[in-house]
């Protein structure tokens, strides 16, 4: 199977997000890469589900709390920017202060 670089990136992100999701479900606090992967994939999947950019910007702030991540992680992630594919094309979704 031949994959484009973009497809490889999406698969890597999805794999990292699955690991983060499982660790979060077990009650472990997420580190920086896990938190970024988790937030990014939820946004990409939300776009796939048909949500709008505005909905995803608001939704992105509800995914993780300070209790879900290691100390200092919220300050390391002032915003998350993800390119997501919508029915009308690819758009950049920016979530400010994703871990309030």
UniProtKB/Swiss-Prot annotation:
EC number of this enzyme: 3.5.1.5
Reactions the enzyme catalyzes: urea + 2 H2O + H(+) = hydrogencarbonate + 2 NH4(+)
Coiled-coil regions, chain positions: none
Source organism (scientific name): Hahella chejuensis (strain KCTC 2396)
Record key words, sorted: Cytoplasm, Hydrolase
Name under which the protein is recorded: Urease subunit gamma
Gene Ontology cellular component terms for the protein in this record: cytoplasm
Keyword Cell inner membrane included in the entry's annotation: no
UniProt subunit comment: Heterotrimer of UreA (gamma), UreB (beta) and UreC (alpha) subunits. Three heterotrimers associate to form the active enzyme.
Domain of life: Bacteria
GO molecular function, one term: urease activity
UniProt family annotation: Belongs to the urease gamma subunit family.
Cellular localisation: Cytoplasm
Top EC class of this enzyme: hydrolase
Pathway entry: Nitrogen metabolism; urea degradation; CO(2) and NH(3) from urea (urease route): step 1/1
InterPro entries in the record: Urease_gamma, Urease_gamma/gamma-beta_su, Urease_gamma_sf, Urease_subunit
GO biological process assignments: urea catabolic process
Keyword Ubl conjugation: no
């Amino acid at each position: 199977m031949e994959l484009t670089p973009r497809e490889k990136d999406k698969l890597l992100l999805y794999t990292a997000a699955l690991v983060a999701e499982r660790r979060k479900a077990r009650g472990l606090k997420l580190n920086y890469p896990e938190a970024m992967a988790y937030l990014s994939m939820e946004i990409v999947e939300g776009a796939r589900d048909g949500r709008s950019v505005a909905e995803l910007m608001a939704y992105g702030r509800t995914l993780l709390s300070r209790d879900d991540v290691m100390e200092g992680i919220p300050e390391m992630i002032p915003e998350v920017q993800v390119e997501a594919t919508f029915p009308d094309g690819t758009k950049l979704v920016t979530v400010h202060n994703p871990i309030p």
